[in-house]
Amino acid sequence: MVKAVAVLSSSEGVSGTIFFTQDGDAPTTVTGNVSGLKPGLHGFHVHALGDTTNGCMSTGPHYNPAGKEHGAPEDEVRHAGDLGNITVGEDGTASFTLTDKQIPLAGPQSIIGRAVVVHADPDDLGKGGHELSKTTGNAGGRVACGIIGLQG
């Protein structure tokens, strides 16, 4: 069993902790709690770089080792880092669990050392017709991020 964690930080008052677990070659389970967000859907992605020297802007594009277009988590054509949306309640918090087979914690495609980012707006899952739909899901600004680190 491989475990990882990302502690989210933000200049906008958003905070949270995201846990990742993977058993062998099974899909990775992602469990998180985030607070300080506006109610509604927020894009949630693994970004390519674990660099926060310039805040969340330094994390690069969505993690996309296969060079595909942006899509929904259940789509065949998607970035590996496309994890869809998290749903934030009226109290500004989100608690969620998801599983995904394209974000392993071990091996050459590992997401350890990369970043997880919560966006200001909903991810249109590549289906919105906006000029950014096929690259970012038109999910808006980066409101919180954290580097995915290995846990003991």
Swiss-Prot record:
Keyword Glycosyltransferase: no
PROSITE patterns: SOD_CU_ZN_1, SOD_CU_ZN_2
Job description of the protein: Destroys radicals which are normally produced within the cells and which are toxic to biological systems.
Binding-site residues, Cu cation: H45, H47, H62, H119
EC number in record: 1.15.1.1
Enzyme class, first EC level, given as a word: oxidoreductase
Annotated compartments: Cytoplasm
Catalyzed reaction equations: 2 superoxide + 2 H(+) = H2O2 + O2
Family the entry assigns: Belongs to the Cu-Zn superoxide dismutase family.
Chief location category: cytoplasm
Quaternary structure and partners: Homodimer.
One GO MF term attached to the UniProt entry: superoxide dismutase activity
InterPro entries documented for this protein: SOD-like_Cu/Zn_dom_sf, SOD_Cu/Zn_/chaperone, SOD_Cu/Zn_BS, SOD_Cu_Zn_dom
Cofactors, names only: Cu cation; Zn(2+)
Record-given protein name: Superoxide dismutase [Cu-Zn]
A GO term from the CC aspect: cytoplasm
Keyword field: Antioxidant, Copper, Cytoplasm, Disulfide bond, Metal-binding, Oxidoreductase, Zinc
Cofactor note: Binds 1 copper ion per subunit.
